[in-house]
């Protein structure tokens, strides 16, 4: 079996103003780092409207299209900009996640990594925010449940920022376990550990600024991995944000590439135990280009090793 890499040139068509941290160079850094890796490269399709309607209302999709500018940028909030190519890029991001689920469920790949932008985990049901437009991972989870007939899907988000959008989109469905580790206090100001969702299927792990890999690993071992194990997911989805890296300029955690490789391996262990190794990972944050590239490669190298039976 192999690891699939899903991406599309359209994702470079989402342009942000000069100096914006969510820039085209992020995707270039990831893809350059993965050059030469033993991956099956797959062209990410556009998401079908019905797939996005599982997590966003039609009026919201229409509003995003309507806000798309003919040139320049349209600001949806102080951080989140549309350019003429942004809508296509956002549809490719969601389409990549959904196609990756189809490939892994069909046995066409052991696992998959979606190298797309813009990211998705801050997009709420009717609100674009935090660089995000559509809930890519949430849409993939709902597709797995409704299209593939799964009963239990786990999402693990180790981006340095709380995955408020993903939580907003999945917490009402008891078939989804959502776990987020994140620095607190930090944008977007959500993700208190006491917030466990209406069905007790939300696990929020708040880490203080300056927390290092030892603290991250201990929190994962204590709070996230046992919950995922007990949930026995038939598929694990990862929101792979690498902005908890010590070199990242937007936050203050102190993780290294080794920590990202470690959590990837531990999640793969759980996937092996419960789902035949089925894992789909989607790129979220990461804003120091060199650290982002190294971290993404460390993450994907573990997926490749596990996908080939290592």
Model feature map: region roles:
Residues 1-156, 161-310:
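HDAC/HDAC-like amidohydrolase catalytic core signature
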């Amino acid at each position: 079996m192999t690891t699939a890499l899903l991406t599309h040139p359209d994702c470079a068509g989402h342009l942000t103003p000069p100096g914006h941290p969510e820039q085209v160079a992020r995707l270039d850094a990831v893809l350059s780092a993965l050059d030469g890796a033993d991956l099956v490269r797959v062209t990410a399709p556009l998401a079908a409207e019905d797939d996005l309607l599982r997590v966003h209302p039609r009026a919201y999709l229409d509003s995003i299209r309507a806000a798309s500018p003919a040139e320049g940028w349209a600001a949806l909030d102080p951080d989140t900009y549309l350019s003429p190519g942004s809508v296509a890029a956002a549809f490719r991001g969601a389409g990549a996640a959904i196609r990756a689920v189809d490939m892994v469920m069909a046995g066409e790949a052991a696992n998959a990594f979606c190298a797309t932008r813009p990211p998705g985990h801050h997009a709420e049901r009717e609100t674009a925010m935090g660089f995000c437009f559509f809930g890519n991972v949430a849409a993939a989870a709902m597709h797995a449940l409704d299209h593939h007939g799964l009963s239990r899907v786990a999402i693990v988000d180790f981006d340095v920022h709380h995955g408020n959008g993903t939580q907003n989109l999945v917490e009402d469905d008891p078939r989804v376990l959502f776990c987020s580790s994140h620095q607190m206090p930090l944008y977007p100001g959500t993700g208190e550990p006491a917030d466990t969702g209406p069905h007790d299927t939300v696990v929020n792990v708040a880490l203080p600024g300056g927390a290092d890999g030892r603290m991250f690993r201990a929190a994962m071992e204590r709070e996230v991995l046992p919950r995922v194990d007990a949930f026995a997911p038939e598929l694990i989805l990862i929101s792979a944000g690498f902005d908890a890296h010590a070199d990242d300029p937007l936050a203050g955690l102190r993780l290294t590439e080794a920590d990202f490789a470690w959590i990837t391996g531990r999640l793969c262990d759980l996937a092996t135990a419960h789902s035949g190794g089925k894992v789909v990972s989607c790129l979220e944050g990461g804003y120091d280009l060199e650290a982002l590239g190294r971290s993404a490669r460390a993450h994907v190298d573990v997926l490749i090793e596990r996908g080939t039976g290592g």
